[in-house]
């Protein structure tokens, strides 16, 4: 069944937290339908039936197997951004989540308004990580070999999107220029940030522009 209204999938097996998060997201984003899942299997079914615009994912649901479940959901719906929402706030867990393809990491301890802003950032195509959980060593600057190798993995379409981002164009304008949906552009932006190892659109644009000027 097709739905015209965009949707956010909340996948968490703790009913009280899931209900509280659903209320937060519903109040912050009334234009989105809220879909719920309480296991890896039900999350897969929801991805297939609801085609959500974002997944807020608990790694410890039944059937997840931790990061293995994140990887399988990432493979199942590669165009859908997935944000891990977790009570485990260690930097190593954050790093592993991003390495496995998460578009963000949201601690369950964050205040309500901060969670809403984190969701907004990810829906806009950014990668969200709280400042205090970011690695202290700056990553993915333009002259960093990791940044260059990440840039080399971008698809031709992702490079076009990045070039238009450098030109200062919004997702809406990029979608018009490339004759694709805005949701497709957001998925490309999330993939670009993930591959370049950066956490914001601005960081991607500045670093890529510097690298391209020096090449």
Label every model-predicted segment.
Residues 15-35:
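Two-component/phosphorelay signaling modules centered on CheY-like receiver
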Residues 61:
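Receiver (REC) domain active-site loop signature in two-component systems and cognate sites
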Residues 39, 64-68:
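Acidic catalytic/metal-coordinating carboxylates
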Residues 58, 86:
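Active-site residues of response regulator receiver
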Residues 36-54:
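Acidic, metal-coordinating helix/loop segments flanking the phosphotransfer/catalytic sites
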Residues 45, 67-79:
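Short amphipathic alpha-helix used as the core "switch/output" element in two-component signaling
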Residues 94-99, 104-152, 213:
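Short, flexible helix-to-coil linker/hinge segments that flank and couple to helix-turn-helix
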Residues 168-203:
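Recognition helix of helix-turn-helix DNA-binding domains
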């Amino acid at each position: 069944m097709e739905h015209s209204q965009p949707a956010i999938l909340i996948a968490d097996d703790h009913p009280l937290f899931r209900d509280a998060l659903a209320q937060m997201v519903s109040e912050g984003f009334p234009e989105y339908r809220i879909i719920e899942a309480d296991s890896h299997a039900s999350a897969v079914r929801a991805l297939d039936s609801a085609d959500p615009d974002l997944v807020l994912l608990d790694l410890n649901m039944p059937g997840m197997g931790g990061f293995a479940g994140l990887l399988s959901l990432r493979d199942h719906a590669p165009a859908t951004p997935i944000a891990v929402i977790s009570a485990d706030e260690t930097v190593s867990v954050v790093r592993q989540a991003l390495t496995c393809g998460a578009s963000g990491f949201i601690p369950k301890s964050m205040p309500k308004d901060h969670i809403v802003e984190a969701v907004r950032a990810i829906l806009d195509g950014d990668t969200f990580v709280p400042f205090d959980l970011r690695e202290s060593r700056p990553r993915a600057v333009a002259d960093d070999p990791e940044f260059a190798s990440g840039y080399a993995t971008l698809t031709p379409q992702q490079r076009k999107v990045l070039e238009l981002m450098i030109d200062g164009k919004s997702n809406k304008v990029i979608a018009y220029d490339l004759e694709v949906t805005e949701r497709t552009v957001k998925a490309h932006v999330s993939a670009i940030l993930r591959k370049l190892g950066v956490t914001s659109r601005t960081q991607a644009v500045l670093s890529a522009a510097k690298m391209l000027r020096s090449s």
